[in-house]
């Protein structure tokens, strides 16, 4: 190994590596050919010499690759074969391993002419619209890539909703396909479609979807409106929390909540004059003057004073009837 390297002291390392590697590969190919031939043809060639020559060339390549700037070389054992025999063997290997001229077949690839994008017309008045040789609507499918030609306007119009119907024909304009998510769901549209029940279909104060319950109840979401608020200060009639000054309506307490920074809670009342009245009020003590009450009214009453009087009179008549009975 070291002897072969010392023979070329002035050759560049890269050139020496390439030469040694090529000679080793050629000798290895020659050895493979010899071993693959018939047994009666192997007695003329000594496989051991070819193997030694191949191994020596690969060792030379390894030594050249591992060598550094100040490497030291040791003289290896001298091979018993003479230099003339090695040169003769090398010439024989080169002669047998000359590559044959490869047959090159040139194929001319004609570029495909892509027609300009055009609109697709579908005529539903005719029995058959898609033929096997239709040129206007041709879809190109491949195993690895799925590509749709200019006739993808049908799919794009089906997705984007572009298209017009006239005299039994649909004219579809070509448009790019919208991307689809990996989960298979279409992207969220800017204007979501919402179904309303028939009762609130044209109402602006209701929004939402129709519930699928069997009872057929309306579950439309009511839009929150700003309620009318009115605040008044009235004197307290007693120190009890439940005692509030009366007014022209009847109220029923439905809850209370503590107030931060005040020892007195806030009471919540709703109108009990008529069932379903949306009017509410809450009463709390004033922080600056505990003898005053702050009453805040919310919402409007859905009844008038005449209806209240009729309700009171009817309730009085019923009491008299029950008393006489």
Swiss-Prot record:
Q: What is the lineage of its organism?
A: Eukaryota, Viridiplantae, Streptophyta, Embryophyta, Tracheophyta
Q: What gene does the UniProt entry assign to this protein? A: WRKY11
Mark the transmembrane ranges: none
Q: Which SUPFAM superfamilies match?
A: WRKY DNA-binding domain
Summary of the function given for this chain in its UniProt record: Transcription factor. Interacts specifically with the W box (5'-(T)TGAC[CT]-3'), a frequently occurring elicitor-responsive cis-acting element. Regulates rhizobacterium B.cereus AR156-induced systemic resistance (ISR) to P.syringae pv. tomato DC3000, probably by activating the jasmonic acid (JA)- signaling pathway.
Q: Does the keyword Ribosomal protein apply?
A: no
Gene3D superfamilies noted in UniProt: WRKY domain
Tell me where in or outside the cell this protein is found. Answer: Nucleus
Q: What happens when the gene is disrupted?
A: Reduced rhizobacterium B.cereus AR156-induced systemic resistance (ISR) to P.syringae pv. tomato DC3000 associated with reduced jasmonic acid (JA)-mediated signal pathway. Plants lacking both WRKY11 and WRKY70 are totally impaired in B.cereus AR156-mediated ISR.
Q: In which tissues is it expressed?
A: In young, mature and senescent leaves.
Which Gene Ontology MF annotations are present? calmodulin binding; DNA-binding transcription factor activity; transcription cis-regulatory region binding
Q: Name one Pfam family in it.
A: WRKY
Q: What is this protein called?
A: Probable WRKY transcription factor 11
Main localization, broad class: nucleus
Give the species: Arabidopsis thaliana
> Which residue ranges hold the DNA-binding region?
240-306
């Amino acid at each position: 190994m070291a002897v072969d390297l010392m023979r070329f002291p002035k050759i560049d390392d890269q050139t020496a590596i390439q030469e040694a590697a090529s000679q080793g590969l050629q000798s290895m190919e020659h050895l493979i050919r010899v071993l693959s031939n018939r047994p009666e043809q192997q007695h003329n060639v000594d496989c051991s010499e070819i193997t030694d020559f191949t191994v020596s060339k690969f060792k030379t390549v390894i030594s050249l690759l591992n060598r550094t700037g100040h490497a030291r070389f040791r003289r290896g054992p001298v091979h018993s074969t003479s230099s003339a025999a090695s040169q003769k063997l090398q010439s024989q290997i080169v002669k047998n391993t000359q590559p044959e001229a490869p047959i090159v077949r040139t194929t001319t690839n004609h570029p495909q002419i892509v027609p300009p994008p055009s609109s697709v017309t579908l005529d539903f008045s005719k029995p058959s619209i898609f033929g096997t040789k239709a040129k206007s609507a041709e879809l190109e499918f491949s195993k690895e890539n799925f590509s749709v030609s200019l006739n993808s306007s049908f799919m794009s119009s089906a997705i984007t909703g572009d298209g017009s119907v006239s005299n039994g024909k649909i004219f579809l304009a070509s448009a790019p396909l919208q991307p689809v998510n990996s989960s298979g769901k279409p992207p969220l549209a800017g204007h979501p479609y919402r179904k309303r029940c028939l009762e609130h279909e044209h109402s602006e104060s209701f929004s939402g979807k129709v519930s699928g319950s069997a009872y057929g109840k309306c579950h439309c979401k009511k839009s929150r409106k700003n309620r009318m608020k009115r605040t008044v200060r009235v004197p307290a009639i007693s120190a009890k929390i439940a005692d509030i000054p009366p007014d022209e309506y009847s109220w029923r307490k439905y809850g209370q909540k503590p107030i931060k920074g005040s020892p007195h809670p806030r009471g919540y009342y709703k109108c009990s004059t008529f069932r379903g009245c949306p009017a509410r009020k809450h009463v709390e003590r004033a922080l600056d003057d505990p003898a005053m009450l702050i009453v805040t009214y919310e919402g409007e009453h859905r009844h008038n004073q005449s209806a209240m009087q009729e309700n009171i009179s009817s309730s009085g008549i019923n009491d008299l009837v029950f008393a006489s009975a």
